[in-house]
Amino acid sequence: MCDKKDVSPQKDQYTFLANCALGLEELIEAEIKGFSGVEVELGKGTVQWQGSLETGYRACLWSRFSSRILLKLSQFEVNSEDDLYQNSFTYDWHQHMSWKTTFAIDCTLSADATVGHSQFAALRIKDGIVDRFKEDGDERPSVKTTQPDVRFHIHVSGNEGTLYLDLSGESLHKRGYRVAGGMAPLKENLAAGIVALSGWPEKQEALPSLIDPMCGTGTLLIEAAMMFGDVAPGLARNYFGFLHWHQHDSQLWQALLDEAVAREDAGLDKTWPSFQGYDADPVVVSSARKNIIRAGLDEFIQVKCSPLVHLGAPTDRGMLICNPPYGERLSETEKVRQLYAAFGRIGRKHFAGWDVAVFISNPDLAESFRVSWEKKYRLFNGTIACRLSTGVFAEEEENSFAWEIQQVEVQEDALQFANRFKKNLKKYLKWAKKENISCFRVYDRDLQEFNLSVDLYEKWIHVQEYLPPKTIDPDLASRRFNIALRAIREILGLRSDRVFIKKRQRQKGAGQYQQQGDRKKMHQVREGNCYFLVNFRDYLDTGLFLDHRPIRLRIGRESLGKKFLNLYGYTGTASVHAAQGGAASTTTVDLSSTYLQWTEMNFSLNGFAENNHRTVKADCIKWLAEETELYDTIFVDPPTFSNTQKANRVFDIQRDHIQLLTLAMRRLSPGGLLIFSTNFRRFILDEKLAEQFDVKDITRESIPLDFSRNEKIHFCWEFRQK
């Protein structure tokens, strides 16, 4: 017989153990001391204490952060599975249950446990219980894995086994109000820990508004409201593991329930702060409303279906708290990074001075919010290591950057180019400031000898060298380009890390989609009220066609309440403008996975979720032939030529534009508008289209001032049904 220590509870003296998510131990310690627990000891994910039965009951009813509350029953030596059976067989189970009592056994093992299989260890304990009752002349008690009358827990660490009664019966995160969870619901006890560590409970008088801008099913808001209203988290539960325990003190438990009801009634009568939640997913918002009603807090918490981009502050002070998407998969990380950037930008713009707390899994992405974090806590959401970061939103800084023309003497061989470049700068910088434009062209092959274009993107400059005519010596062209580049740097006083150079040449087939280098570095720029990611290094084009600026701005102005379709959508910039303009939905179709991912990042950067803004990977002509939806506005900006092996087709804009536009017009709703643009310099629109549709040439008005020197930068038409 193995050594056995009887630690069965004596009257008014019990040993309890609370299990919890890693990082919540100190919060539980404070709770236990508030319940009059003594000799509190913290472990890794555990809190042990001594106290009366009342302290255990209070922990079950009031602990917001614990997962389970265990009552220590016995401790014994374990050198094999047989020792588990022998100690179970000799234990006096009658003090806790009868043969009519349903029961369950859980088992956990430390890494150095002398037994190697938790399920088999639990089975040996179960066998000992059953055989004990049979030995005593009773019938065999029944095992019930879900909500048994009593649940026992055995933990083996090294060669020491400890037997517990699970007072909670099932995890205490099950408050009883959750009707449905989202894709990855946050457990209630972890949510409560996030709220507590955010500092809001102590600051709530100074922070009269609590907003979760990505509220999911509302767990953070519900837990915060329960804290404020002094609502016991276990009050709505109808199951605990002690209700059929033979030593259960029903009078004590009823007294604690009555006290909790009285405290809740008093809490609900207080003057409440504002609790608001928002989410872009209407299905999730519906679940949140159901949970809030189930929790009895629908009078105090309001949730609405709205994307992050529409967030605004209802009061001067408050707190934004959220558990945003993590982006655990590599393909989602960049999209999540842009969502965090949007959250930070919106926070600085509309919530300056507000407290903020975000719970994320990747600490490297915390920088994306651009918040000076004051505190950081390491917590675990299941097995995922996470960080809770808290701070205050600083006021959004005005973009103080401005291009300045330096008063420098350029070398004689650069005079011709320098004079024209400075003249253009004066003209277009003044124009851009007046029109609130930050990305524009300032030189477009104005001089035949200097065959390049120069674009300004915020504080970066993008220089493109074009292949010289065959009549020009390549070495001479190269020298001229270097002369111009030197002059550009001197006139604008540029650091080398702000200048990006590309050599343009005719792209064939998939070449237009190929990377120009190995590194991918994105920069954020603004156009109107939209923000976009541009890449100056890795692809021939940056991700933002500057000559289409007027078209995109028009789409934004005219999209309120409309369904928008973007064919050959590239990086989705027109779709984002439509969304910012209040489009009911956007659909962006492109055959390139790279550009569709880029589109999704652009949407995230602007604070839009994917619910009403879908991306479709498809050949546009094939997709149009199968599509059945109608759209109010359609933008068609196809390539001049593409040879796509995956689609097994060659596209030629001159040859195929009748088929393309005819199919697209079938998807145009009555009274709708289709805008067609092409940059094929020798393009001729087939006259048959004008016979079939109401066609208007808007090329001149669609070309902005900074591209007016090149009348064939693109052609553009409006199409309407006759």
UniProtKB/Swiss-Prot annotation:
Gene Ontology molecular function: 23S rRNA (guanine(2445)-N(2))-methyltransferase activity; RNA binding; rRNA (guanine-N7-)-methyltransferase activity
Keyword list, A-Z: Cytoplasm, Methyltransferase, RNA-binding, rRNA processing, S-adenosyl-L-methionine, Transferase
Family statement: Belongs to the methyltransferase superfamily. RlmKL family.
Name used for this protein in its record: Ribosomal RNA large subunit methyltransferase K/L
Domain of life: Bacteria
Catalytic activity: guanosine(2445) in 23S rRNA + S-adenosyl-L-methionine = N(2)-methylguanosine(2445) in 23S rRNA + S-adenosyl-L-homocysteine + H(+); guanosine(2069) in 23S rRNA + S-adenosyl-L-methionine = N(2)-methylguanosine(2069) in 23S rRNA + S-adenosyl-L-homocysteine + H(+)
GO CC term, one of those recorded: cytoplasm
Keyword Transferase: yes
Cytoplasm listed as a keyword: yes
EC number(s) recorded for this UniProt protein: 2.1.1.173, 2.1.1.264
Localization (cell): Cytoplasm
Matches recorded under InterPro entries: 23SrRNA_methyltr_KL, RlmKL-like_Mtase, RlmKL-like_Mtase_CS, RlmL_1st, SAM-dep_methyl-trfase, SAM-dependent_MTases_sf, THUMP_dom
PANTHER family to which the protein is assigned, alphabetical: RIBOSOMAL RNA LARGE SUBUNIT METHYLTRANSFERASE K/L, RIBOSOMAL RNA LARGE SUBUNIT METHYLTRANSFERASE K_L
Domain THUMP: 55-167
PROSITE patterns assigned to the protein according to its UniProt record, in alphabetical order: THUMP, UPF0020
Pfam families assigned: Methyltrans_SAM, RlmL_1st, THUMP, UPF0020
Biological role stated in the UniProt entry: Specifically methylates the guanine in position 2445 (m2G2445) and the guanine in position 2069 (m7G2069) of 23S rRNA.
